[in-house]
Amino acid sequence: MTNAGADGERRTPLTVSMGARRASGSFSGRANGHLPTVEEVSAGGVVITPASKGFDVAIIARYNRGGRLEWCLPKGHPEGNETYQEAAVREVEEETGIAGSILTDLGSIEYWFTVPTHRVHKTVHHFLLEAVGGELTIEKDPDHEAVDVAWVNLDELDRILSFPNERRIVQTAQQVIQDSL
């Protein structure tokens, strides 16, 4: 199954995996006329706050390269020697304005997409975070990728999030929350 990613590129979602690895950033060779492959990694998460009905989650909206608005979980690349957890906390705060504290690992998703010069195999590590401060804003996003941010009830995310693989991460978060109550 192929869909367009937040950056407008075609992506093929793979299964949710619990493996952890850093992207090498290296290219596989251009054998038999195939595009070289670059490994990328990101981290982000499901940041929750108590709401009148269960929990709300901070999500962001971005325009893909085709100009379509897509709602997704906040995420981004680790910087320097950041761990996935540190990158997730930083990216969530940059893209949503909400400071979060990690509660648990929710697993990883993998997908492929192609840009004109290469194919990208991307792994995104997700964490469940508790909101501990801040206010919703996109003003802290240094890349200005997010065009909107919103608190959405956890039970409504399945119909709002643009990507099936992120909806599966939210289902994992729902199960973790249910198991802890």
What is each model feature region?
Residues 17, 159, 164-181:
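Charged phosphate-binding loop/patch that engages nucleotide di/tri-phosphates or the phosphate backbone
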Residues 1-15:
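N-terminal acidic, proline/glycine-rich, low-complexity intrinsically disordered segments
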